Amino acid sequence: ETEPSAEPTEQSATEHNIPALIAVNGDCIGWLSIDGTSISYPVMHTPSDPQKYLRQNFYGKYSQSGVPFLDSRCSMNGGNLIIYGHNMKNGTMFSDLKRYVDRDFLNAHRTVKFETTDGVQTFIVTEALKTNTSDAWYDRIAAEDGRQLILSTCYGSGKDGRLLIIAAES
């Protein structure tokens, strides 16, 4: 067994075989990728066990980096999508999200692709928001118009700091 590649990929999101990934692990709902970053990973969803993939790899084995996963409050049938991933010191998972605090980087890397069995959904990054776990950001974003993809990772020196990359469906 090899874990889905943590390396950047040049292939477009349409080349990921989502049904084959789901056949290996039924918790997989799609593939997230951002060109020009190392972010290219399967995305998991386990509403009854929200943090299952926090420290577990695609194959269910222990992994410090886990696998990006969809918030248990989210549904693929509509509404906002919130995906969590670790900010790993080795440059994997969502570590590249911290580069979005630089406005030039944000402007040059605005397109986020999320491929599911329904096809490729494209989102355009609109904001990088520094916040914390106690902030009411979820309610604010949930109230905004249009469907959004929010990528969330740890940020800063405290354990409660978060960086949110907010992208609007295009």
Spell out what each predicted region is.
Residues 1-170:
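Solvent-exposed, non-transmembrane regions of membrane-associated and secreted proteins
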